[in-house]
């Protein structure tokens, strides 16, 4: 709810640029819960390709570490669609709250908003290994179907838990 109180809205594309780990996973699920659409780009594809992907995806928001915000400041043309910024860590001279400020403004009893099967869920970029990287728009229905297939294939029963993650 802190993200929504910071100005993000359901359906907003939000670029997530934090190192993979607990914070990355937590923030991705927080964006899903807020109804925002995470934009996930592999930084290993190189600066030029990453900047092209950012420009192509036209995110309205960014949640990122200070280095990514510094790059945003130095290459504004790739980030011109950004209206809302959240810094994970120490904030320098750019606008927007820190993640700690967003957390303090949130409600602990926030309920997830309803999403429809055909609504945008995430934009995931291909690696670019066979040509230019391309953003693939996933819907909630696509993710739900993937979950159903995994549940059936691996025999995951009600009450059991599993957490598949990115490789």
Give the role of each language-model region.
Residues 9, 60, 83:
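Short acidic/polar active-site loop segments enriched in Thr and Asp
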Residues 2-5, 45-76, 146-163:
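Conserved ATP-dependent adenylate/AMP-binding module captured primarily in the ANL superfamily
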Residues 2-45, 161-167:
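Conserved AMP-binding/adenylate-forming
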Residues 15, 32, 38-42, 46, ...:
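Internal alpha/beta domain cores that form substrate/cofactor-binding pockets in large enzymes
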Residues 121-148:
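Conserved AMP-binding A3 loop
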Residues 103-125, 131-132, 155-162:
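Conserved pre-ATP/AMP-binding loop-to-beta segment of ANL
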Residues 6, 12, 48, 99-100, ...:
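Structural detector for helix-capping/boundary residues
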Residues 67-117:
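ANL superfamily adenylate-forming
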């Amino acid at each position: 709810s802190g993200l929504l109180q910071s100005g993000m809205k359901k359906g907003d594309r939000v670029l997530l640029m934090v190192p993979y780990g607990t914070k990355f996973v937590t923030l991705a699920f927080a964006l899903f819960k807020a109804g925002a659409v995470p934009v996930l780009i592999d930084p290993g594809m190189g600066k030029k390709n990453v900047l092209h992907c950012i420009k192509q995806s036209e995110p309205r928001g960014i949640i990122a570490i200070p280095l990514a915000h510094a790059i945003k400041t130095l290459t504004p043309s790739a980030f011109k669609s950004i209206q809302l910024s959240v810094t994970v860590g120490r904030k320098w001279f750019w606008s927007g709250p820190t993640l700690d400020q967003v957390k303090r403004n949130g409600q602990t009893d926030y309920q997830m908003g309803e999403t429809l099967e055909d609504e945008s869920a995430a934009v995931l970029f291909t690696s670019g290994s066979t040509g230019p990287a391309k953003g693939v728009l996933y819907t909630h229905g696509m993710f739900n179907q993937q979950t159903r297939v995994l549940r059936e294939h691996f025999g995951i029963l009600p009450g059991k838990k599993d957490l598949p993650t990115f490789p």
